[in-house]
């Protein structure tokens, strides 16, 4: 119902996500002020869902802000970038010291840091808050990753923890850290999501090529996998999508969808950030590039015509063994993707002084979000037991799972390579694993080459300091 009472929190921007967050808050007993640039959406929300709780509609931004109790908390749910800045600029003159602006959109964490600094100087709190779970999650319980000050979380926390997904009685929400921490963690979440989906797609492609199976038959394999270590939301819906039949043609749904995967940019942001921090997130990077490559249709067609028979004929002799090999390779590659993602979060936390709880991050990803999976409990346990874990791969559970999967992993990548089936995420994850465990890498040669053409110096294994060799002259070595 509509009410003239003071609202505990407000939502401006009532497209699907904003509308569902407002409804979720109202359903959980909070009085919610609602506003949209076009008042028709505000009226529509109250008319259609007013019986779910108490809404206070605001025709104008001034009316909307005036209806909020102090300190005011305003959730902004508009497109990232300039539209978000425009709404903030409209809000600021209407707010008072101590009020809170919450950006629940997919903002770049650097923009969030800029906005937080600017608004803090004006006496306002700014919480960049990641929300994962899509439309259904926003309504029924998402994973929520709030950043910003501890003071802002004191106001927001009780509300966000109430509307978030719950797993084992624990809300999938925690105060991630100051300024851009919440949006940074959400960005990395999305990067892991890219890798997870690419790995699943490659597993499907391998099963289809190796078994000559139909999508419906492969759906049953994924359903079986979802009963074990791979249990996750994405594996569950993969089975649903593969089993779906197109009503218009009677064909498998995946066979009538164009094979061009789109992206909104968070995968690219994740890769760019990792490059800035010097963190090798190879699986996430390959997943992002795979989407880019899928869109280069003209190049793909030209290559297909030029190299029609570049792969060997593939014939699987033992179906069950092959399916198990793909399952183990998928699990090992997935572990690598999560390990890289958590390495990235730790590096960002150190660089920006955020002090992010890695075990806590795994905890709030267990429900509501797109990458929710059974083994997030294991990730939480690993970081709770050893917060300074050098890499998730060496935690006992994950080390055992990866070790058990290595022979299958190698067979799958080798078979795919011979058959000409592209597995960029599987292959790069295996290469990352091998590079990480290698006693010595060929990077020594690279350093020698850099010193040869650019006098970039090198360090020796037998003494301290940097050195340079005069390659063009007498090749003597001297301290740099």
Indicate where each model-derived feature is located.
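Glycine-rich, highly charged phosphate/nucleotide-binding loops
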Residues: 56-63, 80-88
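Small-residue-rich helix-loop
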Residues: 349-383
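NAD(P)+-binding Rossmann beta1-loop-alpha1 motif at the extreme N-terminus of oxidoreductases
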Residues: 1-66, 70-72, 98, 134-138
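Interdomain hinge/lid region at the active-site interface
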Residues: 183, 208, 213, 220, ...
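Rossmann-fold dinucleotide-binding core
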Residues: 9, 84-88, 102, 107-219, ...
